[in-house]
């Protein structure tokens, strides 16, 4: 089980990424625009650097919804491999069954 502070930190990162998404996209568009002047591009880089570090989506980590475990995350279900197996064995995941051949 992950610490509550780690789970809260991830929630904070998601909220910050949502809040600054439009501004970050606008600045990145200016930076990647080849027709923009060098000065405009440089100013956009400086403004992008002033945004909060946690507002970047690449800072987010996928975590299990039940335990907060960061490793062994199965994105389709939002659970770690351990909790997914437990749920599947109890028959709580529709259409998922143990392989047998």
Swiss-Prot record:
GO terms for molecular function: rRNA binding; structural constituent of ribosome. GO terms for cellular component: cytoplasm; small ribosomal subunit. It comes from Citrobacter koseri (strain ATCC BAA-895 / CDC 4225-83 / SGSC4696). Binds 16S rRNA, required for the assembly of 30S particles and may also be responsible for determining the conformation of the 16S rRNA at the A site. Pfam families: Ribosomal_S14. Part of the 30S ribosomal subunit. Contacts proteins S3 and S10. This is Small ribosomal subunit protein uS14. The lineage of its organism: Bacteria, Pseudomonadati, Pseudomonadota, Gammaproteobacteria, Enterobacterales. HAMAP family: Ribosomal_uS14_1 (MF_00537). It comes from the Bacteria. The keyword Ribonucleoprotein applies. Belongs to the universal ribosomal protein uS14 family. Keywords: Ribonucleoprotein, Ribosomal protein, RNA-binding, rRNA-binding.
């Amino acid at each position: 089980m992950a610490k509550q502070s780690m789970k809260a930190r991830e929630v904070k990162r998601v909220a910050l990424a949502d809040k600054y998404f439009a501004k970050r996209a606008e600045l990145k568009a200016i930076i990647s625009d080849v027709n923009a002047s060098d000065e405009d591009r440089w100013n956009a880089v400086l403004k992008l650097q002033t945004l909060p570090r946690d507002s970047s989506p690449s800072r987010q980590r996928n975590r299990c919804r039940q335990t907060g475990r960061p490793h062994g995350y199965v994105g389709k279900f939002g659970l770690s491999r351990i909790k997914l197996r437990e749920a599947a064995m109890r028959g709580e995941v529709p259409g998922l069954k143990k392989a047998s051949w």
